Amino acid sequence: VYTNPLPTNWGSDRGLTDPRSVNVKIQHSFIQMPENQYQPRFEDVRVGYFTTQVTDMTTPDDATPYRDLIHRWNLVKKNPDQGISEPIEPIVWWIENTTPLEFRGAIQEGVLAWNKAFEQAGFHNAVQVKVQPDDAAWDAGDIRYNVLRWTSSPNPPFGGYGPSFVNPKTGQILGAD
């Protein structure tokens, strides 16, 4: 015999009545993939990259029909005929407003030091750094912004971790934290 008893907890605007419960807020963000002239690059196993694996079915006899696309930013020169040019769209990093004031200058200096490497690749001022305003209308978790976050931990890991999200078809970095 099948029975379907009525629920005994009809809910509340104050959350669940069970003291073992926790409220969790979840947000899903969707973005449209860019339509541009970005050219994917395949991994060279001699160099370490973050990669996205894609299946390549164009060679039927290939025992390993997959390729690894490297994750990289889509930097395009404003002036392609110049040796060094500013990019059309620079990589903009935001220092989260919760970062202690005494560390912000050093963090900004460290990030901007990457411009030296980008100059070797032909880009001037490829990386910019801004500080999230205290009254920002956007959250540090907003995927439209590349945010350097400050976290405190009793057991801090060595260094940092920089997750990014990419176009799965090309490996183009669309954003990062």
What are the residue ranges of the model-derived segments?
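Conserved structured catalytic cores and adjacent interaction surfaces
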Residues: V127
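Extended non-catalytic domains of envelope/secretory-pathway proteins
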Residues: G105-E109, A113
